[in-house]
Amino acid sequence: MAAVLTFLRFLGRGGAVTRGLPGGARCFGVRTSPTGEKVTHTGQVYDDGDYRKVRFVGRQKEVNENFAIDLIAEQPVSQVGSRVISCDGGGGALGHPRVYINLDKETKTGTCGYCGLQFRQQHH
């Protein structure tokens, strides 16, 4: 599906061909601006006359294609036995402050506010 979307981008925007895509189609990969410049995860892209493009004269802007929000969304929901779980992001210098998440709420799935990992209580 991603290859089809990329091919259709080259054909043009708003044409008869692009209307045939399903409504829930999602693009994967790095987005590019109309000038061909890569767009970062924050949507940063410079105009042609912007003085900040001086940094990239003679070379391409390097953009990490693995956005953290996409990598976290791919993680499965962790099943735990208790109704309160603590998340420290992996511990040590690579983690975040420990937070406690209640899993007996209406949502039934708890999400860590720091790292985005999701937890669900496994009922016996």
Curated annotation (Swiss-Prot):
Membrane topology: Peripheral membrane protein
Subcellular location: Mitochondrion inner membrane
Transit peptide feature, positions: 1-28
Domain of life per record: Eukaryota
Residue pairs linked by disulfide bridges in the UniProt entry: none
Alphabetical UniProt keywords: Electron transport, Membrane, Mitochondrion, Mitochondrion inner membrane, Respiratory chain, Transit peptide, Transport
GO process terms (BP): mitochondrial electron transport, NADH to ubiquinone
One GO cellular component, as annotated: respiratory chain complex I
Cited InterPro entries: NDUFS6, Znf_CHCC
A Pfam family recorded for this sequence: zf-CHCC
Function: Accessory subunit of the mitochondrial membrane respiratory chain NADH dehydrogenase (Complex I), that is believed not to be involved in catalysis. Complex I functions in the transfer of electrons from NADH to the respiratory chain. The immediate electron acceptor for the enzyme is believed to be ubiquinone.
Quaternary structure and partners: Mammalian complex I is composed of 45 different subunits. This is a component of the iron-sulfur (IP) fragment of the enzyme.
UniProt similarity note: Belongs to the complex I NDUFS6 subunit family.
Name used for this protein in its record: NADH dehydrogenase [ubiquinone] iron-sulfur protein 6, mitochondrial
Gene responsible for this protein: NDUFS6
